[in-house]
Swiss-Prot record:
Any GO BP: ubiquitin-dependent protein catabolic process
Protein name, UniProt field: Putative E3 ubiquitin-protein ligase ARI6
CDD domains the record matches: BRcat_RBR_ANKIB1, Rcat_RBR_ARI7-like, RING-HC_ARI6-like
Residues spanning the membrane: none
Positions of the UniProt region annotated as Disordered: 518-552
Family annotation (PROSITE patterns): TRIAD, ZF_RING_2
Molecular function terms from GO: ubiquitin conjugating enzyme binding; ubiquitin protein ligase activity; zinc ion binding
EC number in record: 2.3.2.31
Positions of the catalytic residues: C305
Superkingdom as given in the UniProt entry: Eukaryota
Amino acid sequence: MMDSDDDMLDAHDMDSVDYDFDSGGTDDDNDIDETDYVFGEADTDDAAIIAYHRSQINYVVLKEEDIRRHQKDDVGRVSVVLSITDVQASLLLLHYHWSVSKVNDEWFADEDRVRRTVGILEGPAPDGREFTCGICFESYPLEETISVSCGHPFCATCWTGYISTSINDGPGCLMLKCPYPCCPAAIGRDMIDNLCSKEDKERYYRYFLRSYVEVNREMKCCPAPGCEHAISFAAGTESNYDVSCLCSHSFCWNCSEEAHRPVDCDTVGKWILKNSTESENMNWILANSKPCPKCKRPIEKNHGCMHMTCTPPCKFEFCWLCLNAWTEHGESSGGYYACNRYEAAKKQGLYDEAERRREMAKNSLEKYTHYYKRWASNQVSRQKAMGDLQKMQSEKLRKLSDIQCTSESQLKFIAEAWLQIIECRRVLKWTYAYGYYVPDDHTKKQFFEYLQGEAESGLERLHECIENDIEVFEFGEGPSEEFNHFRTKLTDLTSITKTFFQNLVKALENGLADVDSHAASSKPANCKPSSNTKDGGKGKKEALTMAGSAET
């Protein structure tokens, strides 16, 4: 483990190749080291949210106005080319899943068929002075009725109720048709604008906006609750699908779960399913209980005596060891705290299989509990770090700036450290899901646990520095000469931790591919040397180089 700041600084200075855990990697890396942090406020007024962007990103965060602009551009292009209104162009694009080329191809191939299919009709002009509404059956003058392209008249009140009900029912309102039976005429945005309440309009245009994103293969809505942003992703040869929204939520473009590097999407799916099913409950029952010999109900032994009594209505009394009736037990069977029958049967191998299954279930449960607790603990720590970051920005930054007589922009290194902690907590969290599926008897397991321990040690050092060392400057009476030393120390720790974690991610994503070849010539004990000896430092270097040589 990293026992001193000097260890981390020495590690950072070591020569390395590619994802040697002590280097910054090559200049063309697109991983978590290539990150520029941008500070900004979210759309909500009650919280300041930090969002970071990669310097070489393969995605763009789109706000609502950006999506509307894209929509408006597509609608305008169709409207101009086909010489139709924007409302009609919107109906066509909705029908053809916002594909401008598909709309143009279908329209010029058979305009009449497209009009009938979409519901853009050219109905007869009304020729009467008074009409009967087809919904409420009241008579109205012509000027008080409304119709779409089909010409079927309905009163404004019935139109409003009909459209409002459809909007409240969900996104199907985007394809709403005339209420006249079997009429295919489409209802466009102009009707919503003229007849609906402000609340209904907002809901309708929210559906309208999302429809543009949902059918676009290069866009996805941010899955964070209440977020209206979308991500435009440019797929390439990189396997990094992690994206970060302006709302501070990071997720995987490929599976839409939260960002989970270095774990692949299939493993994440298995882990989440395991956390949400009853499988571990069954493992606990199997490991800590035995079935009643009569009713087969699982029974947990919670007292020292071997005399067990099943709950009503069964009430069967039996021996916990051999599972035979208690009436058959006594001094001849070994007394109340032992069972000669069980010992004899065990020697004959009669109970080996049941005990083996119970022991396997117990070990499986203990393993899962070990990894799940640490997975969940890092998530809690990450959430706390996010809260500390927001508190620092909203409350402490200005105060620290005043005390140290420096501008807030010069304190950016503090926010960068917190952001690195948040990112490292996320990575560390998912290393426990990764570790759960690494075979226990594999050489990679030992090396993985060594690297994970190094990562935890380095992160704790950074966390301790920003939480504890900064306090003396937050509550000082004036500028301190030691503040520049603190700045240098925190900046160095942030850089070293960032480098270590970005190389850890790369190594795990590569499956620690080179470990097997090194295992043949290196003892597993070398993976975790003592940091108190000179030879131990050499062993650490060799272990770190082991991971770095995979891409040599």
